[in-house]
Amino acid sequence: MDKTKALDAALSQIERSFGKGSIMRLGQKEQVVEIETIPTGSLSLDIALGVGGLPKGRIVEIYGPESSGKTTLALHAIAEAQKNGGVCAFIDAEHALDPIYARKLGVDLENLFISQPDTGEQALEITETLVRSGAVDVLVVDSVAALTPRAEIDGEMGDALPGLQARLMSKALRKLTASIFRSNCMVIFINQIRMKIGVMFGSPETTTGGNALKFYASVRLDIRRVGSIKDRDMIVGNQTRVKVVKNKLAPPFKQVEFDIIYGEGISKLGELIDLGVKVGIVEKSGSWFSYNSQRLGQGRENAKQFLREHAEIATEIETALRQNAGLIAIELLENAGSENTESNEAI
């Protein structure tokens, strides 16, 4: 029997056993589809991700120090999904979601499903049930560190239960991965960082919940607060840096910076100005900003105010930036590469 007949026989047997479509050629025309994405609320981050946003049908991990903007970024993704008619759910394991802040970011609270589970097992069971339904587009788990195993809750405060949470996450992700892909649901895990003891070389930082999430996640975002935004003497927001640490859909290691304004979320207008200057769409002469010979204002804050009052110009700049997305992505990758080289030389 030649190879072709043997292969046909094997394929027929697989389809009889597991159903039609259980195995196919990757290049079959009807099977090749573009990956659906959901915007992050940050234009520069959408470009850095290479596919225009966070991918549906995949696992995403957002991690960083406290008060760095992890939940804010996840809520922006929920708001963007809801704008397109998506169904979203929020597993609030930390019991710390602020509905007033979520509404300010554009989240439709009336159509957001929320659960505040008592144990890690309960949280992950609810997650699996929602994913298997096939009706949810975005599901956020906040956070992995708060997924406390039932045995730990029932035990004494001083009980040593090493690896319990890691085993819980590993088992849950094994069960969830196939369901997430089939249902085309994006699951965002928010995670915290911890310090490893006795690390002499390299970064001592690690994320909670073991290594399973690092492997199963298609996208991992490291978000950090790198500075403060002041209005006279009052701090009104954070300068935030996000690095795409892992990306299975496009080149990783791109790095972007944007502003998060307290009570407002990600400053879209600030991004339009910064990215516009970077690719030459917005001209900067001294402290003045202009677009198509139209002066936007003196200083970044005045230029932002002008765009706030003239939404049509802001839309024009955004359209032009999206058309130049490839050029911006290359520049982001080069900048991140040079920074990595400098840090390696310093070590």
From Swiss-Prot:
InterPro entries reported in the protein's UniProt record: AAA+_ATPase (IPR003593), DNA_recomb/repair_RecA (IPR013765), DNA_recomb/repair_RecA_CS (IPR020584), P-loop_NTPase (IPR027417), RecA-like_C (IPR049261), RecA-like_N (IPR049428), RecA_ATP-bd (IPR020588), RecA_C_sf (IPR023400)
UniProt keyword terms in alphabetical order: ATP-binding, Cytoplasm, DNA damage, DNA recombination, DNA repair, DNA-binding, Nucleotide-binding, SOS response
Keyword DNA-binding: yes
Residues binding ATP: G64, P65, E66, S67, S68, G69, K70, T71
Major location category of this protein: cytoplasm
A Gene Ontology BP annotation from the UniProt entry: DNA recombination
Subcellular location: Cytoplasm
Pfam family, one: RecA_C
One Gene Ontology cellular component annotation held by this UniProt entry: cytosol
GO MF terms held by the record: ATP binding; ATP hydrolysis activity; ATP-dependent DNA damage sensor activity; damaged DNA binding; single-stranded DNA binding
Signal peptide: none
Family membership: Belongs to the RecA family.
Function: Can catalyze the hydrolysis of ATP in the presence of single-stranded DNA, the ATP-dependent uptake of single-stranded DNA by duplex DNA, and the ATP-dependent hybridization of homologous single-stranded DNAs. It interacts with LexA causing its activation and leading to its autocatalytic cleavage.
Record-linked HAMAP family: RecA
Entries under NCBIfam families matching the protein: tigrfam_recA
Protein name as it appears in the record: Protein RecA
